[in-house]
């Protein structure tokens, strides 16, 4: 049965085929061989691209499935990502590839991913969509933290003026060392309500999400982030 899917990444395979890393609605991440997809007359040739809502079918018992159907999904808004939005889309794709295992069902995360791409298409501001997806990814990983209580004491953060973020733990009101970034509790309370209209507060959210995800990403740098920085230096 066909299911909604988007291409996260693609590789050349042999002379005429491609390997696609798909993010699908029902099966999560799946790697498939698109046989003959590079042939000039293949109906899949122009479809096997990131950020194109698709319907896909595949079969096989191994980790590498065989693609049997790939067609555009007519009922979903077309995704038009250019410039910084395109690199932001690559960033989301890389997060999924790095942190979501293959063949692990993730229907809610699929919807979050599609929603993030649509929001980036429709808005001039990409940061809110990125930060929201990062938070939903942390929830999917079981790494969500509380925005209202001190992770050490259980006391409400609002009893204090300043707090600090400890990755894989949460917010605390006592710093671990003098190198930690201090956050205004008032800002954290606004972020907890997803009040991201203020650019300075949105920047704080970026720091928090980056620190939270770094625990799971490890030391290997994100290729999409390096590519984006490279364009800014040109």
Swiss-Prot record:
Keywords: DNA damage, DNA recombination, DNA repair
Gene Ontology process terms (BP): DNA recombination; double-strand break repair
Family to which the UniProt record says this protein belongs: Belongs to the RecO family.
Function in brief: Involved in DNA repair and RecF pathway recombination.
Tagged with keyword DNA damage: yes
Gene that specifies this protein: recO
SUPFAM superfamilies: ArfGap/RecO-like zinc finger, Nucleic acid-binding proteins
Protein species of origin: Idiomarina loihiensis (strain ATCC BAA-735 / DSM 15497 / L2-TR)
The protein's name in its UniProt record: DNA repair protein RecO
């Amino acid at each position: 049965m066909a299911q909604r899917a988007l291409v996260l990444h693609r590789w050349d395979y042999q002379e005429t085929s491609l390997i696609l890393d798909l993010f699908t609605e029902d099966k999560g991440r799946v790697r498939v061989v698109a046989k003959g997809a590079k042939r000039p007359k293949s109906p899949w040739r122009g479809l096997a691209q990131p950020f194109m809502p698709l319907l896909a079918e595949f079969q096989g018992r191994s980790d590498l499935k065989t693609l049997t159907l790939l067609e555009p999904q007519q009922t979903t808004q077309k995704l038009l990502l250019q410039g910084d939005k395109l690199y932001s889309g690559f960033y989301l794709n890389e997060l999924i590839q790095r942190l979501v295992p293959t063949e692990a069902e993730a229907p809610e995360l699929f919807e979050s991913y599609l929603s993030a791409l649509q929001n980036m298409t429709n808005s001039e501001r990409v940061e809110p969509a990125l930060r929201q997806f990062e938070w939903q990814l942390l929830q999917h990983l079981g790494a969500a933290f509380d925005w209202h209580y001190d992770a050490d004491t259980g006391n409400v953060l609002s009893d204090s003026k300043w707090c600090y973020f400890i990755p894989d733990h949460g917010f605390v009101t006592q710093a671990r060392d003098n190198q930690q970034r201090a956050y205004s509790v008032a800002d954290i309370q606004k972020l907890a309500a997803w009040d991201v209209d203020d650019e300075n507060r949105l920047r704080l959210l970026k720091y928090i999400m980056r620190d939270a995800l770094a625990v799971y990403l490890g030391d290997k740098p994100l290729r999409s982030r390096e590519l984006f920085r490279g364009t800014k230096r040109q």
